[in-house]
UniProtKB/Swiss-Prot annotation:
Pathway: Amino-sugar metabolism; 1,6-anhydro-N-acetylmuramate degradation; Cell wall biogenesis; peptidoglycan recycling. CDD domains: ASKHA_NBD_ANMK. The lineage of its organism: Bacteria, Bacillati, Cyanobacteriota, Cyanophyceae, Acaryochloridales. One of its GO terms (molecular function) is ATP binding. This is Anhydro-N-acetylmuramic acid kinase.
Length: 379
């Protein structure tokens, strides 16, 4: 089946689209990437989304208009990737754009992704599955990470302990023990949000460049500085990093206000912008490795990176130094496009929804059981 996956994450830099051919079910799953592209948001739309994520007040009417605009952008991305591939998809899996995420804390969690699937289905003429996270949260889960089952099926290794580490705006990990046969599917797998991915680095770059830059390409600016280890140790004491999984987070926590707190605690150290970026980049690496050290039953032989942060050379260097003997790779090195991986995941989740195969991993999300994810919008 030809399926389009659409995803925009917490970095809010655009819509990742992947057109894939999928066959099989779970461990025999076959996914062939035909085309992948990122379609940047118009600046005005991106700024609107970021304002909502910051918690700025918005009327219901304005939120409806933003939902409309994002749905149309997602539909256009689906049409564009089809045109590039010169073939027609049979199904779309659209994650939408997260603007709010409240993990469960003794009650049900709540999550809101806008860019509704009914509009995408109507505009493209293709059946569309959307709103993937809400069913897991209704069953008491975190609604995240949802890529873990794909990681199990496509990235498990028969000998190595692997951590598949996504570094988008927020970081998340899937821990994969060696897998040798289908009877072990899901056994020992863990996953959770590790904390900030690119979000604090991106916010700091925008702050220090006075809005001229949105990210630190390859970590080049950070590489000119020196990280302040006492600050990193202080920041790691935040309750989120101490909390055991399952856990999830978002821009609600790692926000501009959080960055301002970091800048205030750093004031006495008189750091240059490059030093501050180096510190935030190494802090991001430290949060990842701290999570592994605290909550994994076995250290990883390989850490397989994906997401935009996998292209940050300085961040990879910081990770490798902190990981010691673990090998740091990207999913490209093991046959899965790192930029398109999350979009591919939502194509597969839509495909599983059609086959009535649950898409969550309860041991990862904390849901009460396996759940069929997504809502189907028929043409």
């Amino acid at each position: 089946m030809h399926v389009i996956g659409l995803m925009s994450g917490t970095s809010v830099d655009g819509i990742d689209a992947a057109l894939v051919e999928i066959s099989g079910r779970e461990l025999d799953l076959q996914v062939d990437l035909i085309a992948a592209q990122t379609y940047p948001y118009p600046d005005a739309l991106r700024n609107q989304i970021l304002a909502v994520c910051r918690g700025e007040p918005l009327s219901i009417e304005a939120l409806a208009g933003l939902d409309d605009a994002i749905a149309m952008q997602f539909a256009q991305a689906a049409q564009s990737i089809q045109a590039e591939a010169t073939l027609t998809a049979e199904l779309i899996g659209s994650h939408g754009q997260t603007v709010f995420h409240r993990p469960p804390q003794g009650n049900l969690g709540y999550t809101l992704q806008i860019g509704r699937g009914a509009v995408i289905a109507h505009q493209t003429g293709i059946n569309t599955v959307s709103n993937f996270r809400v069913a897991d949260m209704a069953a008491g889960g975190q609604g995240a990470p949802l890529v873990s089952k794909l990681d199990i099926c496509l990235l498990s290794h028969p000998e190595f302990y692997r951590c598949v580490q996504n570094i988008g705006g927020i970081g998340n990990v899937t821990y994969l023990p060696p897998l040798t046969d289908a009877s072990q599917l899901g056994m020992g797998v863990k996953g959770w949000d590790t904390g900030p991915g690119n979000v604090l680095m991106d916010l700091a770059v925008a702050h220090f460049s006075k809005g001229e830059l949105t990210y630190d390409a390859d970590g080049a600016w950070a590489a000119q500085g020196n990280p302040c280890q006492p600050l990193i140790e202080e920041w790691l004491r935040h309750p989120f990093f101490q909390a055991p999984p399952p856990k999830s987070t978002g821009r609600e926590l790692f926000s501009p206000d959080y960055l301002q707190t970091c800048l205030q605690t750093a004031a006495s150290y008189q750091l240059s912008p490059a030093d501050m970026l180096a510190t935030l980049t190494d802090f991001t690496a430290a949060t990842i490795v701290y999570n592994y050290d605290q909550f994994l039953p076995h250290p990883p032989d390989q850490v397989v990176l994906c997401g935009g942060g996998s292209r940050n050379g300085y961040l990879r260097q910081c990770l490798q130094q902190r990981l010691g003997g673990s090998t740091v790779l990207t999913t490209d090195d093991v046959g899965l496009n790192s930029d398109a991986k999350e979009a591919i995941a939502f194509a597969v989740l839509a495909y599983w929804q059609q086959l009535q195969i649950p898409g969550n991993v309860p041991a990862v999300t904390g849901a009460s059981g396996p759940i069929l994810l997504g809502e189907l919008h028929l043409v």
